[in-house]
Amino acid sequence: MSRVAKAPVVIPAGVEVKLNGQDISIKGKNGELSRKIHNAVEVKQADNALTFAPREGFVDGWAQAGTTRALLNAMVIGVTEGFTKKLQLVGVGYRAAVKGNMVNLSLGFSHPVEHALPAGITAECPSQTEIVLKGADKQVIGQVAAELRAYRRPEPYKGKGVRYADEVVRTKEAKKK
């Protein structure tokens, strides 16, 4: 039995939940998110909470119920508070700028790197070496942050590259003669 699935997801005021078979959509002040629920999971809406239980005949019912509960909880948090992810650019000449829905990066290549942001994601640059991503969908925020980081991952000798703000880069010692 899943401990995660036993806890209900509380729906705060101002959040509207529509449950239609195995499809669910959650609407709040930061937008609307929808998701298809796994067939092994039964979701019930009672008052201002969502409860989860496995369906009969599925071996992985409790596991899927716990996963579904975590995903729907992230959706509720996303439409109420939203998610943010911070990136830092470390290195001489590494710069970032945002124009519309494009993030322009100078990462030491012979050309500037331009990355288009998906719908629902906004970016801002408090300084030339910081990028702050904001949005309602936790998965998309993480995916965009990983794509930006993949252009120039932190290298292990000097730590230069694009890193998450809370990331600790372990540096190696240089080769000795």
Swiss-Prot record:
It comes from the Bacteria. PROSITE patterns: RIBOSOMAL_L6_1. Disulfide bonds: none annotated. GO terms for biological process: cytoplasmic translation. Keywords: Ribonucleoprotein, Ribosomal protein, RNA-binding, rRNA-binding. GO terms for molecular function: rRNA binding; structural constituent of ribosome. GO terms for cellular component: cytosolic large ribosomal subunit. Pfam families: Ribosomal_L6. Coiled coil: none annotated. This protein binds to the 23S rRNA, and is important in its secondary structure. It is located near the subunit interface in the base of the L7/L12 stalk, and near the tRNA binding site of the peptidyltransferase center. Belongs to the universal ribosomal protein uL6 family. Part of the 50S ribosomal subunit. This is Large ribosomal subunit protein uL6.
